[in-house]
From Swiss-Prot:
InterPro entries: Late_L2 (IPR000784). Highly phosphorylated. Belongs to the papillomaviridae L2 protein family. HAMAP family: PPV_L2. It comes from the Viruses. This is Minor capsid protein L2. The lineage of its organism: Viruses, Monodnaviria, Shotokuvirae, Cossaviricota, Papovaviricetes. It comes from Human papillomavirus 69. Keywords: Capsid protein, Cytoplasmic inwards viral transport, Disulfide bond, DNA-binding, Host endosome, Host Golgi apparatus, Host nucleus, Host-virus interaction, Late protein, Microtubular inwards viral transport, Phosphoprotein, Viral penetration into host nucleus, Virion, Virus entry into host cell.
Amino acid sequence: MVAVRASRRKRASATDLYKTCKAAGTCPPDVIPKIEGSTLADKILQWSGLGIFLGGLGIGTGTGTGGRTGYIPLGGGGRPSVVDIGPTRPPIIIEPVGPTEPSIVTLVEESSIIQSGSPFPNFSGGDGFEVTTSSTTTPAVLDITPSPGTVHVTSTNIQNPLYIEPPVDIPQSGEALGHIFTSTSTAGTHSYEEIPMEVFASNTSSGSKPISSTPIPGIRRVAAPRLYSKAYQQVKVTDPNFISKPSTFITFDNPAYEPMDTTLTFSADSHVAPDPDFLDIIALHRPALTSRRGTVRFSRLGQKATLKTRSGKQIGAKVHYYHDISPIHATEEAIELQPLITSEQHSTPLFDVYADADPAPTFTFPSTTPTTIPRFSSTIFSTTSSAPLNVTIPLSTSFDIPIYNGPDIYAPVPSSTWPYIPPPPTTMSHSVVAQGGNYYLWPYIYLIHKRRRKRVPCFFSDGLAAY
C-alpha cells in the first residue's frame, strides 16, 4: 500500500503571526526580528548610518516603498509639500441659557380677549348726502368735436440702382472720318433683359483656356471589388437558390420575401446553419455580378463570428461565396446533318449556280438538234447571247456521278436495278510544249549550278550502284 503524503499547508504571514504570538511569547525566532527591524541587515544599516547620512533614501529591509517620504529622484532635492490654509473665521459667541428661562425663542405677546354680547357701535352723522332734483326733460348733448391738430408730412428719397429707369435721351447725329453714326433712343420698356453673354468653351477655341471649371488629370476608374485576394476564403456554391434565397443556407426559417440588393444580418447564437459552409455567418453583404474566366458570376461576401471576446467583440474570417450562373460564350454543339434528298424525291434541284454572262462579243451559233451525249463525257454545250443566262457548272467529274447538259444537276440515287458497269481503262497522256511565245526563260538559271551531295559508298557494291 502506497502511503499518501499529506499536503503542506502554507504558514501565515509574519505580520499575522506577530499579532498573536507576541503576547503569548510563542513566536518563531525569525518573526520578531523581521517585524521589529532587528535583523542583521538592519543592524548593518544602522552601523553604517553612524558615519554617513542615509536618510530619505528608503534603504532598509522593509517593503521597499521608499520610507515615509518616498524616493527622491537623482539630480534634485525633494520639494516640500505646501498646504493652503484659508483665513481664520471669527469665533461664534455662545450665549448661555439659564435653567429658569422658559425657552430660547421669544414668546408671542398675549392678544386682547373678545367678549361675547358686546353692543354694536352707534354711528351718528351730522350732514348726509345732498340730493338735487330738476324738472327739465331736455336731453343732454355733448359736443365732442376734436380740436384741429397739426399734420407733418415727411418725404425721403432713396436711390436704388436696380430700380432706376434709364434717362430719356434725344437721338443725336454726329460725323467722324466721313462716317455717319446715328444713335437710338434708350427710353421705353422692354419685356426682356439684355445681358452680355460670353462664350466659355467652343470647338474653335485655341485651347489656352480650360473647358471645365476643374479639369481632372488622367482617367479616373471605379475600383473593382477585390474578391480574390488572400484576405477572403473562396467557397463555391452550386445550389442556384443562393441567388434568390440566401438565408436558407444559414437558418431553417423560410421568409416570404428577401431583398436582393441589401445586406442580411443574422444572430450567431440563435441558429445552426443547415449548410456547413455557412457556419457561424452573421452577415451576408449585398451581391455583385462579375465576369470570371468566361462566365457570369454571382458573389456575396460573408462575415463569420468564430470567436467572441469578453468585451463582446466578435472575430471571424471573411468568406467569398460565388455561384457561376452561365457561360458568356455559347458552347459549340454537334448537330447531326440529315440527308436533303431521299430515294423518293427527284424534283428538288441541287447545286444550282446562277451567274451573269460575260459582256463579250456575241457569237451566233446555228440552231442544233438535241444530240445524244455519252454518259461519261465531260463536254458541256452552252449558247451565249447578250442577255444573262443560267449557266450550270459541274462540281465533280468522277466516274460515279454522271454529267448532264441542262439547267440543274441532280444527285444520283442508287438503285438495285442498275447493272454494274466497270469503268473503262484510262490512259494518261501528257503534252509538253517546248517553244512558246507567252513566256521566256531567264538566262541566269543556266549559270546557277546546283550543289550536289557527294555520296560516300559504304560497300563496294553500293559504289558500283551509285556510279
